[in-house]
Amino acid sequence: MGIECVGEVEKTTSSNLKKGQKIVSIMGEMGRAFDGSYAEYVLLPNEQVYPVNTSLSWEELATVPETYYTAFGSMGNLQIKENDNILVRVGSSGVGIAFLKLVKAKFPNIRIVASIRKKDIEKRNKILSLGYDEVIFDNNNILETEENFDKILELIGPVSIKDSFSHIKEYRIICATGLLGGKWFLEDFDPTRDIKNNAYLTTFYSGNVSEEKINSMLNYIEKYKIDVKTEKIFSLDEIVEAHKYLDSSSGFGKVIVINK
């Protein structure tokens, strides 16, 4: 497994890459069609190796793809304005937290609300400490609020998308990005009935990637001095522990694995 990695070029057949070049790679069937990034050396197709120019440390850079890339793309597709009222469904997720940091860095006074799926007061307080303005609860994929929003980042997926449409304002946007609800498809979906009239549905897929887009994101992070430090760091021989942590109730945000 391992669908993302950062590192330096050790050897290549590409004239566009040089030994020692700092690179990022995400998606492209890594960890599926061929071995992924859980290794000291990773063999990748040239076309999915993206050279980057950044002053971020290795720990910081490792935190960025694919989480920040997904959040950055979603932010662009949501066409964020400084007076927007935004909802992030599953605000404690890695993408949700990255999205919060990216948006708040540019619009510090914008209102961003997080939803969480368990009534966990400790997690609620931790989320608020990150900079969310309010936390609401998802009760079996139904939001426990009557509030409507200008923009919704939908990270749960098909199991909650119809409920999200009941909370979007007229002429505003939902970006369906995540599948944290564990369901990949939406059955019995009629766009003319299920998409709220005069509202918009878009999406972002992290497989839509290029060197230019990766570096645009990194430039944004450095321009706005965004703190991308991760929640927790594991070494390569602690991958099992890393997955156990993510699966536990204490799992929060994104963790990274470093080859020490």
Locations of the language-model features?
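Glycine-rich beta-strand-centered segment in the early N-terminal region that forms part
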Residues: 1-30
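Short, well-ordered loop/turn sites that connect or cap secondary structure elements
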Residues: 16-17, 80, 168
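N-terminal Rossmann-like NAD(P) cofactor-binding module of classical short-chain dehydrogenase/reductase
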Residues: 24, 152-153, 175
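NAD(P)H dinucleotide-binding glycine-rich loop of Rossmann-like/cofactor-binding domains
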Residues: 26-90
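Mid-domain Rossmann-like dinucleotide-binding core that forms the NAD(H)/NADP(H) cofactor-binding site
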Residues: 62-140
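C-terminal hydrophobic helical "lid"/dimerization subdomain
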Residues: 73, 209-260
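Glycine-rich phosphate-binding loop and adjacent beta-alpha segment
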Residues: 122-123, 159-223, 259-260
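A short acidic, Gly/Pro-enriched loop at the edge of an enzyme's catalytic core
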Residues: 144-152
